[in-house]
Amino acid sequence: MKYMTTVAAVFLSLACATAPAHADASVKDGKVGLSVKGKGLSVKQAGGWMDGHGTGVRARLYTVHKGQRTDITRWKDATPVTAGTTQFSNVDWNLNGRSFRNGSWLCIEFNKADGTPCAKIHR
């Protein structure tokens, strides 16, 4: 039994050591959340959610690099989603592997909420 535990621990440490670096992140600020999928400085998909439903809920992505803000997308209508008793508004973008500068922040902004979560893009 002790041998199997040692072998399992060694295997787990080797598996974790060889895992590729990735740029996946999930961040929440108040009622707003941001999810980013990609690798390194390249982002494949980004999306966000806001707690609760509302009419006219829209969102957009922007970056901040060295204090300068740049809008990445235009305003996009969010889709209201109900899962059991949970209600939220969801929006997604396919960024097709768009590259960002190292150290920039990818952020989401909703027109009906105050939170603006950001994920740092880095190598």
Give the residues covered by each predicted segment.
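Short, surface-exposed binding/anchoring microloops in extracellular/periplasmic proteins
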Residues: D24-I72
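Secretory targeting and sorting signals
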Residues: M1-A23
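Short linear motifs in intrinsically disordered
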Residues: W49-D51, D92-F100
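Solvent-exposed serine/threonine-rich low-complexity stretches and specific carbohydrate-binding patches
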Residues: T70-T86, R123
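Short, exposed beta-strand-loop hairpins at the edges of beta-sheets
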Residues: N96-R123
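Short loop/turn segments at connectors of secondary-structure elements within structured domains
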Residues: A17, H53-V57, N102, G115
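Short, intrinsically disordered, low-complexity terminal segments
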Residues: L12, P20-H22, G56, W75, ...
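Aromatic sugar-binding surface patches on proteins
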Residues: L41-K44, T82-N94
